[in-house]
Amino acid sequence: MIKNKRNLFFCSIFYLFSVDSDAEKNLESLMSVLYSQTSGEIKATFVQTYNTATELLDKAINDEDWDAVLESEGKRNRTPAIILDVDETVLDNTPFNARSIMNQTSYPEGWDIWIYEEKATLIPGVKDFLLSAQKRGVKIFYVTNRRTVYEEATKNNIKKLGLPFDDDVDVLLTRGENGWGSSKASRRSYVSENHRVIMMFGDNLNDFFDLPDKADYVSRKESVLEYENMWGNKWFMLAN
């Protein structure tokens, strides 16, 4: 917390004395980071999301028809599992965003350095939820579009934070691994072959289903409504 406040302080000072022509853009970025790091409301939504999911665990585990993956073939007698995106769903990278503002850089510049530092912190509520799921025999899978080259550092970061991580099974599925592209559909299918995915978590619609290339805001809204029965019981969107 102290480190985050220090980041915010220096970000604010940097902006006040900046003469960059992109000052308006810098201000937007600064306000976004300030909100993410200081807002009680956004933290409450994270905790609320994971608390709601915790309350549904037993129901989801015991219902053989409870399946969160659209690509699933509906096989019976599979081990229950949960799929989570990593960035801004499990790991909080707002210190990286603050650093980018201070350095006048933008993603992906510096992203690899940040990952290798293994210093991302937890999204509020996620640890208690995952530990509760693990105690119930649920397998935890992390499906991320971080590239395969970052897999070891990402695994280390997750394990340092005390989150469930199975070393006997590949539970961290990265972009580029096994020929997987940026679409997560193939990785969802991979997990669902032997596991009944009872819940999925993410901060982007593509964490739950594939959208058409260059989908506009209208089609995105329509897609959300098409699957409205999934949100809040099988699918959980986190604010970003």
Question: What are the functions of these language-model segments?
Answer:
Residues N51, R147, E151-N240:
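C-terminal cap/substrate-recognition subdomain and adjoining C-terminal extension
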Residues Y35-A44, D112-K119, F141-R147, G176-E177:
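Second-shell loop/turn segments in exported
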Residues N4-C11:
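Sec-dependent signal peptide recognition
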Residues S12-D20:
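Hydrophobic h-region of N-terminal signal peptides that target proteins for export
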Residues L91, N97-L122:
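Metal-dependent phosphoesterase signature
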Residues V19-L84:
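Non-catalytic pre-domain segments flanking phosphatase-related domains
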Residues E88, V126-I158, D203-L205:
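Substrate-recognition element of Asp-dependent hydrolases with the DxDx(T/V) motif
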Residues I82-N93:
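Asp-based phosphoryl-transfer active-site loop
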